[in-house]
């Protein structure tokens, strides 16, 4: 795990890590809440971070009021939250960097890029939005009653994390993952801190900043995820000059779940101009490690079938397909459907 350091932002200490030796500095701004040390204990997230570090020098931090950073002395405004990016860049010795923000982290990256264009090399958002709540002229946000329902769920089940299972259906039944997620939540924020963070997100409306973004921009969204409607990213791409929109497969809001390499490949290509040569990988096990259902799903995936098509063929839910594929990828040591198909013979899988 990389060393954790602190940067001073006014009266608040911001915890950050810098790792990787790629040619591009990349500030990774997480969504909602985070814990930069516990992140390395979850295999999917740790692999996501290592993959970023393979092509960039990554600056990863906990926003004020979450994780290892100081609690916010009061409800921080957008300007304060956004300026924490500048502070960690200074501390890490980065004069100019690409910005990568997940969910509300994307909003902070957009605000930073608009305020500090000279320090922003490029912008990547994933699963983000221009406004969190629905309005007459912005129909993709959450209705106020849905926010209230989510807050009630947080109050009832913060300690277990079950209130957020709908955001990441591929791991909803994965007991090991859910146990880590519950511990991650408890370490990253108290229930009242989590409620406060979601309340701040509900107030976000950065539509007025979008015309000020003048750097190369990549907007990524999983078309079928339910936590943040894809219409949000379509709006961002339509209102940021020259932005490229990439819609990817999957149902999870967290980018490190499901086919994370589809997202990572898009980011690497955007930032570096191409993909590094595939490195030789050793798989943990072969086809014999898969359950019968996993073998069925993998065979259909190798044949080119989509998750909805596999679900229909096997009379199961798309959520179940995504969950089985994620487990199969982990067992086989592959990270995408493309790699699965390419290495099927080596892994003892028939197409």
Stretch-by-stretch model annotation:
Residues 6-70:
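Conserved HGGG/HGGXW glycine-rich cap/lid loop of the alpha/beta-hydrolase fold
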Residues 213, 219-221:
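Short beta-strand/loop motif that positions the catalytic acidic residue
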Residues 226-232:
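Conserved alpha/beta-hydrolase "acid-adjacent" motif
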Residues 279-326, 330-332, 339-351:
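Helix-turn-helix DNA-binding segment
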Residues 79-97:
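Conserved acidic catalytic loop of the alpha/beta-hydrolase fold
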Residues 110, 114, 120-153:
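Flexible "cap/lid" loop of the alpha/beta hydrolase fold
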Residues 243-283:
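Catalytic active-site module of serine/aspartate enzymes centered on a nucleophile-bearing elbow/loop
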Residues 156-200, 209:
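Conserved alpha/beta-hydrolase catalytic His-Asp/Glu region
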